[in-house]
Amino acid sequence: MRIKRSVHARKKRREKFLKSAKGYRGAIKRRYRLAKQHYYRAKWYAYAGRKLKKRDFRSLWITRINIAARQNGLKYSQLMHGLKLANISVNRKMLAELAINDPPAFSEYVKIAKEQLQKEAVK
């Protein structure tokens, strides 16, 4: 039978949590129970943060595209609809990069979107 609660295993487990709590302040870095709780909480926040990061970046890209599109006389939603009508599939990250680093190229996309929107309005 395998023994899971030996003194050696307990000490190793304890050291693992205390080692991971090295940068914490106060009792958290010295007390096993608190260190363990904060270790698990930190792991959960790290996991959740990785999910939130995706949301935050998408929101940032949309904001940047919207600002640049409005400077060129279109709203964000109109720009995206116009690009879809033109069968141009460029992702938001690249559009945001163009809007910041290469405004003339972004203006070309806006111009194409405007043309497509006008064609749709005529129909």
UniProtKB/Swiss-Prot annotation:
InterPro entries: Ribosomal_bL20, RIBOSOMAL_L20_CS, Ribosomal_protein_bL20_C. Keywords: Ribonucleoprotein, Ribosomal protein, RNA-binding, rRNA-binding. One of its GO terms (biological process) is translation. Gene3D superfamilies: 6.10.160.10, Ribosomal protein L20. One of its GO terms (cellular component) is ribosome. The keyword Magnesium does not apply. It comes from the Bacteria. CDD domains: Ribosomal_L20 (cd07026). The keyword Protease does not apply. SUPFAM superfamilies: Ribosomal protein L20. One of its GO terms (molecular function) is structural constituent of ribosome. Belongs to the bacterial ribosomal protein bL20 family. Binds directly to 23S ribosomal RNA and is necessary for the in vitro assembly process of the 50S ribosomal subunit. It is not involved in the protein synthesizing functions of that subunit. This is Large ribosomal subunit protein bL20. It comes from Pseudothermotoga lettingae (strain ATCC BAA-301 / DSM 14385 / NBRC 107922 / TMO). The gene is rplT.
